[in-house]
Amino acid sequence: STRELMKQSASDLGRVSPERLRDEIFKMLGGPKPDACMRALEMLGVFPYLMPELSAMKGVTQSEPHIYDVWEHTLSVLGYLEAIIASLRIGYSAEETNDMFTGLLTLRLGRFREQFTAHFANSLNTDRSVRAALFFAALYHDVQKPATRSVDEAGRVRFFDHDVKGAEVASQRGREFNLSNDEIERIEKIIKHHMRFHFFTSRLEGDKQEPSRKAIYRFFRDAGEAGVDLVLVGLADLRGTRGPALTQETWTAALDIARILLENYWERPQETVAPPRLLDGNELMRELNIPPGRIVGQLLEAIREGQATGKISTREEAVAFSREELKKAETG
């Protein structure tokens, strides 16, 4: 059991197989109170032997609106993520909540309960849950903040590229833990793209601008199914950043973004997220009389984006658009 594992002195963990350690960690991450479990592991001093890259987060300070250091923030995101997922399960009753933020969440996103349940029932690997992979990604989402921390002239703390670099670190750990490629890819996407939700939220709150169809299309093109996880992490990240200082306005903006993304993904995917294919590469090459090459893939992607934004809706329009693009490329 985990407890016996703990009883061996921390330094003996080096002798335990990475798979065995991984299984224990994933059991904790996929089970109840993942935040408390990770806090316990940190206090027991086992991270240097299990996941040394996590130790650096402790005590790393951040600017407003953050109220916690990077490690405390990470734990609080795990806690909020657990609560958010629980409040979206089938059979959750609003009476269970006495907290305004959760109430607003279930009001805005409650209609997606069945889709969320199906999302977590999908398997990336027979031995481990999608849920555990999501919590692993949340544990690592800010892992590269310590390494990317800088302070600008105004005294603001910045963490440039911590998302992209964090995805690489988590992916490396995933390989050492012998996770499946599907799991590693899911974890990478969640960490790499975790700032996009915040950009959407602040644009909506600050400029009253909803994400464009192009932005929604690109979000899911890059994230795929991980887009659902990104919405959950985004909401948990916001609560774990502001804590008690979170305003109803910001939370409502975030829930609107969540709703917009999820309804596009789940309720009308053929409109923006995954428009139906109007023609394939061979047909395009025939129509334009061009040989195989990178340009074919680029044109097909540009057509899809045109469909997503509503500019292109028929095969004829797709061909005409491609002719124009090809001309531009040739004269460019």
Residue spans for each PLM region:
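Histidine/acidic-rich helix-loop-helix segments that form or flank divalent-metal centers
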Residues: 60-69, 96-129, 179-249, 270
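Alpha-helical hydrophobic/aromatic positions enriched in membrane-embedded helices and signal peptides
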Residues: 133-134, 229, 272, 281
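Residues at alpha-helix termini
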Residues: 44, 177, 236, 287-288
